[in-house]
């Protein structure tokens, strides 16, 4: 049975390319900046994406005295994801569409410069899935890099805000958009693409930092030449060991040319290991959401990747959810940490997937070390087989096994995952990761859908609701919380502690040397907890719901903590897009989120504010 697909309310002009001779290696500059905790120079505070700060002026004893130091209104409503950069005492702030960038003087809080790109809202906004968000900026080579919603990548002079160059990264008329923060690596700017719900084939691209010229592009699926996979050198985990992927490892897992509209987009966060010269990231769900229309494992959607930063060639790749049947979009960040596992120090890559499993891999080889549920409510799979690396799917919750036009009930987690894009933090003091999580399940009904370029290519109806189970034991307890904040040991795959939250925690966390971990809540609280115990030490209600990441820096000898508030994102789409949540028929609106989060509007409204906190003088 075919059903009409309706575009949902969720969420240009290109300048001439200016040729600039020579190239510079910017990552030595970025590395130097990130080693000084007075800066917050990348989305994750460092190349490894750990979101940890050595600052400790704010600690477990005095954080209770924290108070707002100053605020800044962005002038834009809807979802504010990401967080501010602070580079050499200057703050850089971004907004959701229209993607305005502000440079702020911290002494006066005055705007040094602002830049708003020219974009066609009528073309771009209708094809933005899950709100008009933007996750932040990148700095390098004296430039601020903005990845616009309309896919244009723009380089701005960090001192003046003048455009240096811009380049088109995709075509919004085909459903392509961008929401992620780019990453500067050596003489390149790394970026990806959004649009999996429109049949966009995902890729990672590297542009020259000086000229904007394309250096390389590696697709998530397709022939080896497209994916930049070397059949004999690129490895994966199977049969209990690391081994070459072999020829046509992607196309052999698709029926016909379905891979050309196969999804696997790359709208998450990117990490980098300078010693290994590898870029790490995740690829998203296959298109369509109806698994019956795309037989096979659909490689390499739903995968973790390690690519050579110079050439884009794939070092290793690991697929977490073969033939994804639930939209468990695998784009979440990969944090790079050296840890002792079973008595041996390992260079690890740690990833908390929307599918509810926390993965620890050897980041050098791609060897699978740990794969365990970080929310025990997860039921779509019983476990991950460590030899094959494949999840063991429970047929009761298999949307393909149950069939098209059949409502598969009680699947945990819901499509927005046990964790969405909001990045984790890691404290070397405790050895724990801190996870902002969702505690939501769903009913999921796939249906046949036809592909039309630039039109939604979803093929499923879903509704979401509280998991009603204990996070640590998985036992039904009648709880109605939609979120939690969890401490996790990635060496053993065990939950250390977990705090319930009324709504999903959609804010990236921050760990500090002061023993404090910060995060924001959907109803708008900035919270501080003890890194060891999870005990709440501080809370403050900001002007709107928080889906931004908490960042910290130092200015004139004083530590500051800042976070953007502005409710939105998938969980907050009902408020952000003005969808009616007052009728039962709205349960499936916003791709299922409106019904689950209908009470959120009683706690917060639209906004767009940066709130900066500090201890009193």
Curated annotation (Swiss-Prot):
Induction: Highly up-regulated in the presence of lanthanides such as lanthanum and cerium. InterPro entries: PQQ_b-propeller_rpt (IPR018391), PQQ_MeOH/EtOH_DH (IPR017512), PQQ_rpt_dom (IPR002372), Quinoprotein_ADH-like_sf (IPR011047), Quinoprotein_DH_CS (IPR001479). Catalyzes the oxidation of methanol to formaldehyde in the presence of lanthanides (Ln). Contributes to methane/methanol metabolism when La(3+) is present in the natural environment of the bacterium, allowing bacterial growth with methane as carbon and energy source. Thereby is an essential enzyme for Ln-dependent methylotrophy. Uses a specific cytochrome cL, encoded by the adjacent gene in the locus, as electron acceptor. The methanotroph M.buryatense can produce 2 methanol dehydrogenases (MDH), namely, MxaFI, which is Ca(2+)-dependent, and XoxF, which is lanthanide-dependent. Lanthanides, abundant in the earth's crust, act as a regulatory switch between the two MDH enzymes, since micromolar amounts of lanthanides are sufficient to suppress MxaFI expression while increasing XoxF expression, even in the presence of excess calcium. Keywords: Disulfide bond, Metal-binding, Methanol utilization, Oxidoreductase, Periplasm, PQQ, Signal. This is Lanthanide-dependent methanol dehydrogenase XoxF. GO terms for molecular function: calcium ion binding; oxidoreductase activity, acting on CH-OH group of donors. It catalyses: 2 Fe(III)-[cytochrome cL] + methanol = 2 Fe(II)-[cytochrome cL] + formaldehyde + 2 H(+). The active site is at 327 (proton acceptor). Monomer. Interacts with its cognate particulate methane monooxygenase (pMMO); this interaction underscores the potential importance of lanthanide-dependent MDHs in biological methane oxidation. Its EC number is 1.1.2.10. It comes from Methylotuvimicrobium buryatense (Methylomicrobium buryatense). Binds one lanthanum ion per subunit. It comes from the Bacteria. Pyrroloquinoline quinone binds at residues 135, 179, 194-196, 265, 267, 354, 420, 506, 570. Pathway: One-carbon metabolism; methanol degradation. It is found in: Periplasm. Pfam families: PQQ. Residues 1-26 form the signal peptide. La(3+) binds at residues 197, 285, 327, 329. GO terms for biological process: methanol metabolic process.
């Amino acid at each position: 049975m075919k059903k009409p697909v309706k575009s949902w309310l969720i969420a240009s002009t290109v300048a001439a390319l200016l040729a600039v001779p020579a190239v510079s290696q910017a990552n030595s500059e970025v590395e130097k900046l990130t080693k000084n905790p007075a800066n917050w120079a990348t989305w994750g505070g460092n190349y490894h994406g750990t979101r940890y700060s050595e600052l400790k002026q704010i600690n477990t004893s005095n954080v209770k005295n924290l108070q707002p130091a100053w605020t800044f209104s962005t002038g834009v409503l809807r979802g504010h994801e990401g967080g501010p950069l602070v580079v050499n005492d200057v703050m850089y702030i971004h907004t959701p569409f229209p993607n305005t960038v502000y440079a702020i003087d911290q002494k006066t809080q005055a705007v040094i410069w602002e830049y708003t790109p020219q974009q066609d809202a009528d073309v771009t906004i209708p094809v933005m899935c899950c709100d008009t968000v933007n996750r932040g900026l990148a700095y390098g080579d004296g430039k601020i890099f903005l990845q616009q919603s309309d896919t244009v990548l723009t380089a701005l002079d960090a001192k003046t805000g003048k455009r240096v160059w811009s380049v088109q990264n995709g075509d919004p008329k085909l459903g392509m958009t961008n929401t992620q923060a780019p990453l500067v690596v050596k003489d390149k700017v790394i970026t990806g693409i959004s649009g999996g719900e429109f049949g966009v084939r995902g890729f990672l691209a590297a542009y020259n930092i000086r000229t904007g010229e394309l250096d390389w592009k590696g697709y998530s699926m397709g022939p080896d030449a497209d994916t930049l996979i070397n059949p004999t050198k690129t490895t994966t985990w199977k049969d209990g060991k690391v081994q070459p992927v072999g020829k046509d490892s992607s196309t052999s897992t698709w029926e016909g040319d379905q891979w050309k509209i196969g999804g696997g987009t790359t709208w998450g966060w990117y990490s980098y290991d300078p010693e290994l010269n590898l870029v790490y990231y995740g690829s998203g769900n296959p298109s369509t959401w109806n698994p019956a229309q795309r037989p096979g494992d659909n490689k390499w959607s739903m995968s973790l990747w390690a690519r050579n930063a110079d050439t884009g060639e794939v070092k290793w790749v690991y697929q977490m959810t073969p033939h994804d049947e639930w939209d468990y979009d695998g784009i979440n960040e990969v944090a790079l940490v050296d840890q002792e596992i079973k008595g041996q120090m390992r260079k690890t890559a740690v990833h908390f997937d929307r599918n509810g499993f926390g993965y620890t891999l050897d980041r050098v080889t791609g060897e699978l070390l740990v794969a365990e549920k970080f929310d025990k409510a997860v039921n779509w799979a019983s476990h991950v087989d460590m030899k094959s690396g494949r999840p063991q799917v429970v047929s009761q919750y298999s949307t393909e096994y149950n069939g098209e036009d059949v409502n598969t009930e009680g699947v945990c987690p819901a499509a927005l995952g046990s964790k969405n894009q909001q990045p984790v933090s890691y404290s070397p003091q405790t050895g724990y990761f801190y996870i902002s999580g969702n505690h939501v399940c769903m009913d999921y009904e796939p249906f046949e859908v036809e592909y039309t370029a630039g039109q939604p290519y979803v093929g499923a109806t879903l509704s979401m609701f509280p998991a009603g189970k204990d996070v640590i034991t998985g036992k039904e307890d009648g709880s109605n919380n939609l979120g939690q904040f969890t401490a996790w040991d990635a060496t053993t795959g065990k939950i250390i502690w977990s705090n319930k939250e009324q709504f999903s925690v959609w804010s990236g966390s921050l760990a500090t040397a002061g023993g404090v971990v910060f995060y924001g809540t959907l109803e708008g609280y900035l919270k501080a907890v003890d890194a060891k115990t999870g005990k709440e030490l501080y809370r403050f209600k900001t002007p709107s719901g928080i889906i931004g990441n908490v960042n910290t820096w130092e200015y004139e000898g004083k530590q500051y903590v800042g976070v953007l508030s502005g409710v939105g994102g998938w969980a907050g789409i009902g408020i952000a897009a003005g969808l009616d949540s007052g009728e039962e028929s709205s349960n499936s609106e916003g791709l299922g989120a409106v019904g689950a989060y209908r009470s959120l509007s009683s706690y917060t409204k639209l906004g767009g504010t940066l709130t900066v906190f500090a201890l009193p003088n």
